[in-house]
Design a protein with these regions (language model features):
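Metal-cofactor-dependent catalytic cores
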Residues: 1-148
Length: 148
């Protein structure tokens, strides 16, 4: 089982993201009050998740302390390997998510954080994209269950 460590949204695309203690996820729409709510290209992009362990490892590698929110993923988790969950479902309270694919880092993030080589360093360590199959609310500290 995993755990939600933080929830991260932005009201305006490409603006700074910020933490919230809880969020409402709506099937087929995304995270309420997030700039991408009802504004994603594909259903698999409704929500993003990233492992806190990958963030910590990256920070150790570059000897900096980049805040988890600066990676611009919606849900920061611990205790589960997200990359192993491609095409699987997870449950958080009444919410069911289907993990579709690994998010690869983008040059936008590298330029924004001003870290040369970031894209290469974060290949396969930059989170996953998921589809919301059932609506509900989640909070920091909630448990994540992997469905069979």
């Amino acid at each position: 089982m995993g755990k939600i460590e933080a929830i991260n949204i932005t009201n305006i695309s490409e603006e700074n993201t910020f933490y919230v203690n809880q969020a409402i996820l709506e099937k087929g729409k995304g995270i309420v009050n997030d700039s991408y709510y009802e504004n994603f290209k594909e259903k698999k992009e409704q929500v993003t998740l990233i492992n806190l362990e990958d963030i910590n490892n990256f920070n150790n590698e570059i000897r900096q302390n980049i805040d988890a929110k600066d990676f611009r993923r919606n849900i920061i988790v611990s205790g589960i390997n997200l990359n192993e969950l491609i095409n699987k479902k997870i449950k958080i309270n009444e919410i069911t998510l289907k993990i579709h694919e690994i998010c690869q880092p983008c040059k936008y993030l590298q330029d924004r954080l001003k870290i040369p080589g970031l894209v290469k360093m974060l290949v396969n360590k930059s989170g996953v994209r998921a589809e919301i199959l059932s609506s509900g609310s989640l909070s920091v500290g909630d448990v994540i269950k992997i469905l069979k």
